[in-house]
Swiss-Prot record:
Pathway: Secondary metabolite biosynthesis; terpenoid biosynthesis. The keyword Ribonucleoprotein does not apply. It holds the Pfam family Terpene_synth. This is Sesquiterpene synthase 15.
Length: 430
């Protein structure tokens, strides 16, 4: 029996979903969440999302307060597209409100588990923050975004389980360097300075600092020192080969950032598919982060797995496309005011003569199609184990969450600050 046959049980002879479903809020919600795992050519799941979304919105005014909050949250953040720790915290609260329909013992275990992990995560954040302060790049590079707490939260979205403590430590630090690199190439460096830095990173040798400006020397030496330290640690477990793959991805990222800088300084609007999106796979930073996310993982992260991800497999391309386009949508207006490099919005408008609204609609369709590709890559057998695919999927979920309505990373003092506090600091109410 096909998995689609399960959904056909809820349709009539014409293939429409049965109207009786509209009175079952929990059933609609379950159908809505299940349909989020759709892939291409599954029209019955496309219709399920349309059907459930429409009727859940109609039901909202009639629902109890707790159920209304749960439905509203699901419509904005379906489980397949959100951060696990945030969803866990939210659903504990939702189910506490529905004591009559929930197993209280199960809720108590969930609360205990969340609290234990929260304490562990707070200790990890203290260690990361200490490292960040000792590095002192935030003070020396005042133009860069100082977001170490937000980046640790980002990392928690990739993996929160106890066994990934070392992996989280490494990935958060990589995120810090990626964020600074982005700011250097996007907002601060001149084209001449960026040319010198790009060449130095290609060489990946401390001798390459001779032509760099003072602030770039600080960044560059800090970057190389960090990767050297990671290599020394991994060498103890015969896993130092992993670092070469991570460095290679960092070089690809810098090339992509440099290409954007050249477009900007040349007042060039690139072609949407063959130029912008091709470069955007790397400029999304997801290939760099996905590769780095495996550095501190177990023996399943083999050399063959690193070779596989370095070829930009479809699941990584889909993840990167989603992250790139979501970022473009929420930062578009601000970047126009700043006179920044053309994003996918301008590229699409320029190439197809579309309005801004038409470009937004089309790009959201592209995002949904890439989610279908991503789902297919996660659900079908692959050349690497699922445990290695989860960080790729979870990086996409973080992007969906952080770039939902705004660039919550750049403007983290808005809504993101409260979410981080809820996950990392606030105790669960009894």
């Amino acid at each position: 029996m096909s998995h689609l046959d399960v959904f056909r049980k809820f349709t009539d002879d014409q293939g429409n979903y049965n109207k009786e479903l509209v009175n079952d809020t929990h059933g609609l919600l379950s159908l809505y969440e299940a349909a989020q795992f759709r892939v291409h050519d599954e029209e019955i799941l496309d219709e399920a999302i349309n059907f459930t979304t429409t009727h859940l919105k109609l039901l909202l005014p009639k629902l109890s307060n707790s159920l209304s909050m749960q439905v509203s949250y699901a419509l904005k953040y379906p489980i397949n597209k959100t951060i696990a720790r945030v969803a866990t915290r939210k659903y504990i609260s939702f189910y506490q409100e529905e004591e009559s329909s929930c197993d209280q013992v199960l809720i108590n275990f969930a609360k205990l588990d969340f609290s234990i992990l929260q304490k562990m995560h707070k200790r990890e954040l203290c260690d990361i923050t200490r490292w960040w302060k000792e590095l002192d790049l935030a003070n020396e590079l005042a133009f860069a975004r100082d977001r170490v707490v937000e980046l640790y939260f980002w990392c928690l979205g990739v993996y929160f389980e106890p066994q990934y403590k070392v992996a989280r430590n490494i990935l958060t630090k990589v995120l810090c360097f990626v964020s600074i690199t982005d700011d250097i190439y996007d907002t601060y460096g001149t084209l001449h300075e960026l040319t010198l830095l790009t060449n130095a990173i290609e060489r990946w040798n401390l001798d390459a600092t001779e032509n760099l400006t003072s602030y770039m020397k600080l960044f560059y030496t800090g970057l190389l020192h960090f990767y050297n330290e990671v290599e020394k640690e991994l060498e103890k477990e015969n896993k130092s080969f992993r670092v070469n793959f991570a460095i290679s991805e960092m070089k690809k990222l810098v090339r992509a950032y440099f290409q954007e800088a050249k477009w900007y300084h040349g007042n060039t609007v690139p072609k949407m598919e063959e130029e912008y999106m091709k470069n955007g796979i790397q400029s999304s930073a997801n290939p760099t982060l996905a590769t780095a996310s495996w550095l501190g993982m177990g023996d399943e992260a083999t050399k063959e797995a690193f070779e596989w991800i370095s070829t930009e497999p479809p699941i990584l391309v889909a993840s990167s496309n989603i992250a790139r386009l979501l970022n473009d949508i929420v930062s578009h207006e601000r970047e126009i005011e700043r006179g920044d490099v053309a994003s996918s919005i301008e590229c699409y408008m320029n190439e197809y003569g579309a309005t801004k609204e038409e470009a937004y609609m089309e790009i959201r369709k592209i995002i949904e199609n890439n989610w279908k590709d991503l789902n297919r890559g996660c659900l079908k057998p692959t050349t690497v184990p699922r445990v290695l695919l989860m960080p790729v999927l979870n990086l996409t979920r973080v992007a969906e969450f952080v770039y939902k309505d705004e660039d919550a990373y750049t403007f983290s003092k808005n809504n993101l600050k409260e979410v981080i506090s809820m996950v990392l600091d606030d105790p669960i109410e009894e």
